[in-house]
A protein has these predicted regions:
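NAD(P)H cofactor-binding loop motif with strongest signal on the N-terminal glycine-rich segment
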Residues: 14-15, 81, 104
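Glycine-rich phosphate-binding loop and adjacent beta-alpha segment
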Residues: 84-152, 186
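Short amphipathic alpha-helix with an adjacent loop that forms part of the alpha/beta core around
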Residues: 61-72
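N-terminal Rossmann-like NAD(P) cofactor-binding module of classical short-chain dehydrogenase/reductase
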Residues: 55, 75-78, 100
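Local beta-strand N-terminus motif with an aromatic residue
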Residues: 7, 51, 72-75, 153
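C-terminal hydrophobic helical "lid"/dimerization subdomain
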Residues: 135-186
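Mid-domain Rossmann-like dinucleotide-binding core that forms the NAD(H)/NADP(H) cofactor-binding site
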Residues: 1-59
């Protein structure tokens, strides 16, 4: 919800996931330069959504490749696997940059390299929608609604389940590699 990201560089981890997929579109709509990660076979799909650069998340020189795209470091990062990327993030951030942390499912208790973040003044903005004040949530809904009504946001739906198949839907949510959200039809 930063006031303006136009012209800023944004790193979005996991661009092919449900969060990354939407983050790419919203950041592009707001005028950002987008660097994202995914499997190589997803490159064209993510470029079609608005990513300027798609990098292989398994590349052991990922931090260097990000810095080739943003030599001074990225202004903003959207991180869906914080624990997995905790050591790389300060390497790719510009001083006083912001990391919006949405998740860390693979490593909920990572060892935090405090000094690396401290000496760059990196701000961590941990996002948990359920805890957002209603006024902040309303602003976010307005941004999403604006992008959607201006044909700049195309949610990806992997599959739809009936309410009786709620357990199957949950199993599908937990599977890696899906392409979009899982919906329950009520």
């Amino acid at each position: 919800l930063q006031s303006s990201i136009k012209g800023k560089s944004v790193f979005i981890s996991g661009g092919n996931g449900a969060v990354g997929h939407l983050a790419i579109q919203l950041a592009k709509y707001r005028g950002a330069k987008i660097i994202t990660t995914a499997r190589p076979d997803k490159t064209e799909r993510l470029k079609d959504l608005g990513a300027d650069v798609v990098l292989d998340y398994t590349d052991n020189k990922l931090d260097q490749k990000v810095l080739e795209c943003a030599p001074n470091g990225v202004d903003l990062a959207v991180e869906v696997e914080f624990g997995e990327n905790i050591e790389m993030i300060p390497k790719i951030m510009r001083p006083m940059g912001t990391v919006c942390v949405y998740g860390s499912g693979k490593n909920m208790n990572p060892k935090f390299p405090f000094g690396d973040y401290l000496f760059k003044g990196i701000k961590l903005d941990i996002i948990l929608v359920y805890l957002m004040p209603l006024s902040v949530r309303a602003k976010l809904i307005k941004v999403i609604h604006d992008a959607y009504t201006n044909n700049a946001l195309f949610p990806s739906i992997d599959s739809v389940y009936g309410l009786r198949d709620c357990a199957k839907a949950h199993e599908q949510v937990m599977k890696p590699g899906r392409n979009g959200a899982i919906l329950l039809k009520i």
